[in-house]
Amino acid sequence: PAPSETTGESTPAPSETTGESTPAPSETTGESTPAPSETTGESTPAPSETTGESTPAPSETTVPSGESTPAPSETTVPSVPSGESTPAPSETTELRIIPPEVSTVAVPVTTGQITPAVTTEHSTEEILTLPPPVVGPVLPAKPTVDISKYTNTTTTKSTVPTTTIPPKATCCGSSGESVQAGHMWQTGCDVCTCNGTSGKTQCAPRQCEKEIICKSDERRVLRKPGKSCCGYCEPLTCKHNGTEYKLGATFIDKSNPCITYRCDASGLTVNVKSCPNEQVCSKSERTYDSDGCCFSCDTSCKPVPATVGIQGEYDYQNEKTNCSANIIMAKCSGQCQHKLTYDTIDNKVVTKCRCCKADRVEPRKAHLVCDNGKKKIYKYKHITSCKCTSCTAYNIRL
C-alpha cells in the first residue's frame, strides 16, 4: 500500500480575526496546506487511510500540553470598573501561531513490508507575535480638573439659630367655609383677604377705576350693594311723607291745602297761599276754589235739596198702623248781607239781620209705606224759591 500523503509544511491561518483578516496561502504543487479550525490547547492527529493494515501516520505533531498556546479568534477586552470608561482599540491584536517545521525522510521499501513514513520534527517552538498597541483616549480613573479652587475648603459651623415656621392659619369665608391664608374674595362691595398670621379676615372697600360724574338733574349714589359698588347716577327726586316725586313736580299738602310743595334740584320748596276777602259763614255755605284752600260764602239765597224722614200713625179700616218714608224736599240756603246802623238815641251800633227764607212753594205728594203693607199718600209743600228777608218775618209753614 502507498503511504498516505504527508503534509510537507502546514501553516494554519486562523479562521476568524477581528479588525484585520489574514488570507490563507495558496496551494503549491505536491504540498497541501489545509486551513485548520480554531486551535485549542491540543491538536488531534488525523490518521491516514491504508489498505489492509493501517499504520497511523500523524499529519500533525502533537503539541505538548505544557507548551500549547491557544489562538483565540476574538480578543477579550477587560472589563472596566463602574464609573470609568475605557474605549476599545480600533484594531484587534493579531495572534499568529507558527507551527513546528516538519520534514519527511524517504525510507527504502522492501517487497511485502509496509514501512511507515518517518517524520522528523525539527522545531516545536511556537512564536507569539503581537502588533504594537494602539494609543487612544483613555479616561482617567479620577477627574483631572481640580475643583478645589472652585470650592471653599474651609468649613465653618453656622451659628445662626434655626427657627421653625408655624403653619399658616386659616380664616372663615363668607359662607362659613374654611379658606387658606392669602385667599381673596368679594363680599358685597368689600374685598376680603385671609391673614395667615392672625387667622382673621380683613375687608376693605373695593377700589373703583374711574370717578362717576353726574348731570345737573342727577345725583350720585356712592354705594348700593347688589346694584353698584362704584357708584352711579340717578335722577333727582324728592320724598314727602313716604311718597317720591320727580324733579319739577308740584303737589299740595294733604293735611293743609293752602301749602304747595315743589321739587327742585336743591330739594323741596314750600309755598303758602293766602286767601283775600275772607268771609265768615257756615261750612255748608262755603264754596272752595280748585285747590280747596280759599272759599267764598254763597250770598245768593236759593233752595237746595234736602232729605227729610216722615213717619206717622194712621187709621186704616178702623185699625191704626204706622207709616213712614224718606222724601227729598228743598230748603233755603245762602248768606244774606247784614246791615249795620248807628242808633243816635242809644248811641250804639245796631245790626239788622237778614235771613234766607222761602219765597214760593208748591204742593206735592209722597207715598208712605205702612206696617200692614199698604201705602198712604202724604201731601206737603215744596219750596221752589227763596229770598233774603228780615229775620223777624214769619216762617212759611211747610
UniProtKB/Swiss-Prot annotation:
What residue spans carry the region label Disordered? 1-101
Q: How is it modified after translation?
A: Extensively O-glycosylated.
Q: Tell me if Repeat is a UniProt keyword of this record.
A: yes
Q: Which cysteines are joined by disulfide bonds?
A: C301-C356, C323-C370, C332-C386, C336-C388
The segment(s) forming the CTCK domain are 301-392
- Decide whether keyword Disulfide bond is in the record: yes
Q: What is its main location?
A: secreted
Spell out the SMART domains in the cross-references: CT (SM00041), VWC (SM00214)
Sequence ranges of Polar residues compositional bias: 1-92
Q: Give the signal peptide, or none.
A: none
Q: Which Gene3D superfamilies match?
A: Cystine-knot cytokines
Keywords, comma-separated and alphabetical: Disulfide bond, Glycoprotein, Repeat, Secreted
PROSITE patterns in the record: CTCK_1 (PS01185), CTCK_2 (PS01225), VWFC_1 (PS01208), VWFC_2 (PS50184)
Cite the VWFC domain residue spans from the record: 169-234
Q: Where is this region: 8 X 11 AA tandem repeats of G-E-S-T-P-A-P-S-E-T-T?
A: 1-93
What subcellular compartments does it reside in? Secreted
Pinpoint the residue ranges of every sequence repeat in the record.
1-7, 8-18, 19-29, 30-40, 41-51, 52-62, 66-76, 83-93
Read off the InterPro entries from this record.
Cys_knot_C, Cystine-knot_cytokine, Glyco_hormone_CN, VWF_dom
Q: Where does the entry say this protein is expressed, by tissue? A: Expressed and stored exclusively in mature mucous glands of the skin.
Which PANTHER family does the UniProt entry name for this protein?
Answer: MUCIN-19 (PTHR47246:SF1)
Q: What does this protein do?
A: Could be involved in defense against microbial infections. Protects the epithelia from external environment.
Q: What is this protein called?
A: Integumentary mucin B.1
